[in-house]
Amino acid sequence: MITAIITGASVGIGKASAQAFLAEGYTVHNVSRRPCPVEGVNNILCDLTCDDAIAATCDELKQVITESQSVALVHNACQMRKDSTSQCTSESLREALEVNLVAANSLNQQLLGHLPRSSSVLYIGSTLSEKAVPGSFSYVISKHALLGMMRASCQDLMGSGIHTALI
């Protein structure tokens, strides 16, 4: 069995990713607060800002992983806020980073050691991973950081048989 675990697959790019993986024969698991409406997707409801919820979800996912020949762990969940340097409070930035970055780190930390060789860790980036536009302060910061996380992951996973990329 080949498996895709996608955070935030309930809407947008995550939902489209779920459809694409299903079309390629993957068993797809959506990890998010809301269910994915795509038929055939297994939903694991999880608040990605809550450490206990992530830990419980990872316990469930470890069983899924043990039954898989290959896993694509797709970090897609994201908050996109319209904010600016002068408007974004530290609390608001922390909330965005919790979903956009810290959740990916938590999932990696708890699941990487269980992924079989030939698996992949995919980060959903943006053109704003490398540039900026006005009115997207917290989003730009988090996407730049996600690119850094992928680059660091690439170095750390070298030789493990696990591929990583930012898309």
Report the location of each language-model feature.
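Alpha-helical segment proximal to the catalytic Tyr-Lys
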Residues: 113, 155-156
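Active-site loop-to-helix junction immediately N-terminal to the catalytic Tyr of the SDR YXXXK motif
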Residues: 88, 132-140, 152
